[in-house]
């Protein structure tokens, strides 16, 4: 009974996270789509991040709930359910990395930034990073999976034959995706290096920006612009930090499972469920950060919610002017 209650609580929390993730990130996409002030290359990368978070709510979380229940299905169907969230995670990491590089260029070469980073180039980068994310996330389909061990203990074949490709396996993540892939390839190879690169980039951004601010010959306009860039970098660094805090626990558990299998056998189910919930909750956080840190996003969110959710026809922006467009800013 305790397990059933725990599973019910897990499913309820996952569904709540899914609903909030979809609502918040659809709002982000709508804000960028409707506000010319928000249509910048930086925000295109944030839309890519939001799209991944919408997919987490619509697909990855339902898949995770399905896997947590351990139903029986054929091996490759289960493998797809398990790998889909890896695609979205990798896309999020690449989008965050692209934003970090974008902000680095804005600080390092401000005079050439607009010619280097255009909307067309940003959309091209987004297309490439999604292709890479699918390639990395679906790598287990190339053979790095647990098919041999999973099918060795499968239930009776679906068609009544002894063909192992038709047999049913208990669909649990660890039954189909080996921890060696999750730790060595996914975490050490595809998650940790980009996070460390982003850490180095943001440290460099703040060092360069602080040196420039200390220059007494800076014009007031240049100083104001630089301060806006620093504010944007702080907001984006906050998003990266929250991403790391939300995802590192589940990767830490994976490392323990691989390197200390004896101890991992006794790991409580609630610990893994909590780590998974925390990783999924990351998809809810970003719209809150945007609203808190950026006036353009905050005002556009207010206008969209007032007009399309509350059905108010006379929508006033944060400056009290009816229908006023958000003031253009340098970013978050």
Curated annotation (Swiss-Prot):
Keyword Hydrolase in record: no
Primary residence: membrane
Record field: transmembrane: 9-33, 44-67, 79-101, 122-144, 179-203, 236-259, 268-291
Organism domain of life: Eukaryota
Keywords assigned by UniProt, alphabetized: Cell membrane, Disulfide bond, G-protein coupled receptor, Glycoprotein, Lipoprotein, Membrane, Palmitate, Receptor, Transducer, Transmembrane, Transmembrane helix
Single GO MF descriptor: G protein-coupled adenosine receptor activity
Organism of provenance: Oryctolagus cuniculus
Glycan-bearing residues: 153, 163
Cystine residue pairs: 78-171
Cytoplasmic face of the membrane: 34-43, 102-121, 204-235, 292-332
One Gene Ontology biological process: vasodilation
Subcellular location: Cell membrane
A GO CC term assigned to this protein in UniProt: plasma membrane
Protein name: Adenosine receptor A2b
PROSITE patterns referenced in this protein's UniProt entry, alphabetically: G_PROTEIN_RECEP_F1_1, G_PROTEIN_RECEP_F1_2
SUPFAM superfamilies according to UniProt: Family A G protein-coupled receptor-like
InterPro entries to which the protein is assigned, alphabetical: Adeno_A2B_rcpt (IPR001435), Adenosn_rcpt (IPR001634), GPCR_Rhodpsn (IPR000276), GPCR_Rhodpsn_7TM (IPR017452)
Binding-site list for adenosine: 174, 254, 279-280
Residue positions of covalent lipid attachment, annotated as S-palmitoyl cysteine: 311
One Pfam family this sequence matches: 7tm_1
Membrane topology type: Multi-pass membrane protein
Gene: ADORA2B
Residues on Extracellular side: 1-8, 68-78, 145-178, 260-267
Family classification: Belongs to the G-protein coupled receptor 1 family.
Function noted in UniProt: Receptor for adenosine. The activity of this receptor is mediated by G proteins which activate adenylyl cyclase.
